[in-house]
Structure formats: C-alpha cells, structure tokens
Amino acid sequence: MDDEEETYRLWKIRKTIMQLCHDRGYLVTQDELDQTLEEFKAQFGDKPSEGRPRRTDLTVLVAHNDDPTDQMFVFFPEEPKVGIKTIKVYCQRMQEENITRALIVVQQGMTPSAKQSLVDMAPKYVLEQFLQQELLINITEHELVPEHVVMTKEEVTELLARYKLRESQLPRIQAGDPVARYFGIKRGQVVKIIRPSETAGRYITYRLVQ
C-alpha cells in the first residue's frame, strides 16, 4: 500500500476513534473531531513507510466528561497480528498510570494467547480490540443504524416500574453487536433504540445486552 493511501486510512481510523470516544462520553475537542486530512498530515506526517507517522504516534488518552479520573487509552500496535508481549507492555503502562480501560486497534487480529490474556485481565482491566477495517467508517453514521442510547440504572428501574416488567422480559441485543461494541455497552446494561417513524414521529424500543 502506498504512503498516500495508508495516510488516508490512518486519518479515517483515528477520526472514527475520536468520534467513538466522544460518543462514549469522553472529552474530545471539536478540532480533533473535525480534523482534516491536511491537518492530520501536518501533525503526524504523510510517510508511514518511513515511520512518519508510526502507529504508536497515534496513541490517544482521553478522560471522561463526568469523571476526569475515568480515563481510557487507545493503542495502535505496529505489528499486524498482535501477540501477548505487546498486551503485557500495554497492561504495564495502564498499571503505571492507573488506567483500567483501553481500546486496541489491530491490523489483522490477535494471537490466541493475546486474546486469552484480555479475558484473564477482565474485569480489573478492560481491553477491547477493534479491527482497523471496522473503523474506516463510523457505523453509527450509517443511515440505516438508529440512534442508540445507554440507559442509567435509575432510568432502567423507572422503565421497568412503568411497564411492570422484569429485566429478563426485555428483548435482547448481543454484546458483540457492532453498535454495542462501538459504544462499549456491557452485558446487563439496557440500551434505548430510537428509530424515526412515519406515523409516530419516532419509535422507541429497549434491549437488554447479553
């Protein structure tokens, strides 16, 4: 892949990551959300083949709007298939900086032992992997994807009381659903899905993540 194409891909991927962080409630500036390809090149370079940028230069650290101590790393490993050694390096950095959540943007995937290490570290350290291919477009901007809103515990309690339901009676959505992964929705959370409706203006459904 030539430098121009690779620079474009890295810009698109980082832009989606910034939108994802923002949509999860982390503090991202408008400049970062709106960064143009030219601005990306000025900041990071346009010769990936010569290490400008190296993927590690794209690392992101964001703090949550509601709680500045709730921080999240986004790592961009160099190797196409990520091994356990890299995961250990990331975990050590997270321990040193007292950060418990991270996203890892991988080119081709992870080795089985690296994948297993993510499972072993949960729930103390939550590391989510995304294939870079998934981030070339922002799935939530697709016109067929309705708006998803993660509900607070209080909102869920109120919802169940209003409709006299038990949580187990709610319809389900898989934690592996692409939109659920984008928002980092965990098992046991409830998501409100808002669709436009020609008759009712908007049509709201609720899903329990499993």
Curated annotation (Swiss-Prot):
Q: Which NCBIfam families match?
A: PRK09570.1
Its GO biological process annotations read: transcription by RNA polymerase II; transcription elongation by RNA polymerase I; tRNA transcription by RNA polymerase III
Q: What is this protein called?
A: DNA-directed RNA polymerases I, II, and III subunit RPABC1
Question: Which family does this protein fall into?
Answer: Belongs to the archaeal Rpo5/eukaryotic RPB5 RNA polymerase subunit family.
Q: Which HAMAP family match?
A: RNApol_Rpo5_RPB5
Q: What does this protein do?
A: DNA-dependent RNA polymerase catalyzes the transcription of DNA into RNA using the four ribonucleoside triphosphates as substrates. Common component of RNA polymerases I, II and III which synthesize ribosomal RNA precursors, mRNA precursors and many functional non-coding RNAs, and small RNAs, such as 5S rRNA and tRNAs, respectively. Pol II is the central component of the basal RNA polymerase II transcription machinery. Pols are composed of mobile elements that move relative to each other.
> Which lineage?
Eukaryota, Metazoa, Chordata, Craniata, Vertebrata
Q: Where do we see the Glycyl lysine isopeptide (Lys-Gly) (interchain with G-Cter in SUMO2) cross-link in this protein?
A: K81
PTM sites of type N-acetylmethionine: M1
**Gene Ontology terms: cellular component:** nucleus; RNA polymerase I complex; RNA polymerase II, core complex; RNA polymerase III complex; RPAP3/R2TP/prefoldin-like complex
What quaternary structure, including any partners, is listed in this protein's UniProt entry?
Answer: Component of the RNA polymerase I (Pol I), RNA polymerase II (Pol II) and RNA polymerase III (Pol III) complexes consisting of at least 13, 12 and 17 subunits, respectively. Pol I complex consists of a ten-subunit catalytic core composed of POLR1A/RPA1, POLR1B/RPA2, POLR1C/RPAC1, POLR1D/RPAC2, POLR1H/RPA12, POLR2E/RPABC1, POLR2F/RPABC2, POLR2H/RPABC3, POLR2K/RPABC4 and POLR2L/RPABC5; a mobile stalk subunit POLR1F/RPA43 protruding from the core and additional subunits homologous to general transcription factors POLR1E/RPA49 and POLR1G/RPA34.
Q: What keywords appear on the UniProt entry? A: Acetylation, DNA-directed RNA polymerase, Isopeptide bond, Nucleus, Transcription, Ubl conjugation
Subcellular localization, per the record? Nucleus; Nucleus, Nucleolus
GO function term, MF aspect, one: DNA-directed RNA polymerase activity
